[in-house]
Amino acid sequence: MKFIDEVELELRGGKGGDGAISFRREAHVANGGPDGGDGGKGGDIYFRPNYGINTLLDLQFRKIIRAEDGENGKRKNQYGKGAEDTIIEVPFGTLVYENDKLIEDIVEERDYLIVKGGQGGRGNLKFKTPRNGAPFMNENGSFGEKKRLRLQLQILADIGLVGLPSAGKSTLLSVLSNAKPKIGDYDFTTLSPQLGLVKSSDSSYTIADLPGLIKGASEGKGLGIQFLKHIERCRVIAHIIDFGSKDKNPINAYEQILEELRLYDETLLERTQLIIANKEDLEDFETNLNLFRKKFPKLEIFQISALTTKNVNGLKNKLGEILSKAKSYRKKIEKTETTIVFEKDFEVVKKSENSFEVVGKKITDLVQRIPFNTYENLMRLNNKLKNLGVWEELIKYNVKNGDYVKIGEFELEWNNEISTYK
């Protein structure tokens, strides 16, 4: 499966259903009155983390995802059915950004509400009053939220395997865990992070095999920096180093990887670390091991042969033991605080000599919610706009009979007594 760790997409909550206008028509029931039901709620969109997914590939080509709309209200005070919510499965460790601000960090086993659906509109039963026993008024359902998002995956693994190309990371992962990575005798066999679940005698944990690092990885060379970010949440860093091949220098390999980690993020050097000396089955292993111990006498080294699986079970238990004492680095990334901006209810913009536009979310939402389908609805909208000061502001702009006033998606023809829908 192709590894994709960053995608952009647009999510749209479902629209609420429209409220109904209807009246009781039953035998032996005089003056039955209104019985129009409310519209149903539009569907929300949730992200649900799944341990079985470790790529954003499924979302790469889903540029727009829409939740379902709520049903319209019906006669006999029947409410419209609320829409089913839309669940999108994502990998654990997915970061959700809107306008480059972090809004969610998917690290817990629960559903995350990302986009809300619209509310259902009221039916005419809700508008009944002592003064108006038969109202011809209703509401449209509101639109759902719309968000343009960037998703970035930072894999959640307990242990990160790092090393130079061809150090044996993929082979080790395949014998340690249930993972089946591609294995070859050439550099960069692993082109993307591979996750595996390891079960030791008394614990289980996840381990990630990161593509081989080369000098300059922290500056973007090779495959390095593209995947170094995936080690940021690992609690333990396990260096797998080739100690057996004649043309390899374990000391240089270790120092090179340390330097790339330091250049990328020096706090990575504070993590619990283990040296895994691989290729014990080769003849130069002991010589290289002795030289390494002299250079780094305080480092903990565990000897294995991933190819023959020698000491692999012992390594499983050792990693589990180290992990039980390691500090957690799975702190949730702090979300960016939302700045509350107080905006005007509306603003009048003169487009031409006889054309004006009223802009402002409160006003456009109001016009969207009140249908232009009955005289009473038109009067209700007119009164609300008047009470909010819209008409007074337009008069200041010398609006005249016959001029056009655009509000939201609608255009009204101005009349000194009342605006009528064009």
Swiss-Prot record:
InterPro entries: G_OBG (IPR031167), GTP-bd (IPR006073), GTP-bd_Obg/CgtA (IPR014100), GTP-bd_prot_GTP1/OBG_C_sf (IPR036346), GTP1-OBG_CS (IPR006074), GTP1_OBG_dom (IPR006169), GTP1_OBG_dom_sf (IPR036726), OBG_GTPase (IPR045086). The lineage of its organism: Bacteria, Bacillati, Mycoplasmatota, Mycoplasmoidales, Metamycoplasmataceae. It comes from the Bacteria. GTP binds at residues 163-170, 188-192, 209-212, 278-281, 305-307. Residues 157-324 form the OBG-type G domain. An essential GTPase which binds GTP, GDP and possibly (p)ppGpp with moderate affinity, with high nucleotide exchange rates and a fairly low GTP hydrolysis rate. Plays a role in control of the cell cycle, stress response, ribosome biogenesis and in those bacteria that undergo differentiation, in morphogenesis control. Disulfide bonds: none annotated. Residues 338-416 form the OCT domain. Its EC number is 3.6.5.-. GO terms for molecular function: GTP binding; GTPase activity; magnesium ion binding. This is GTPase Obg. It is found in: Cytoplasm. Belongs to the TRAFAC class OBG-HflX-like GTPase superfamily. OBG GTPase family. Monomer. Residues 1-156 form the Obg domain. Pfam families: DUF1967, GTP1_OBG, MMR_HSR1. Coiled coil: none annotated.
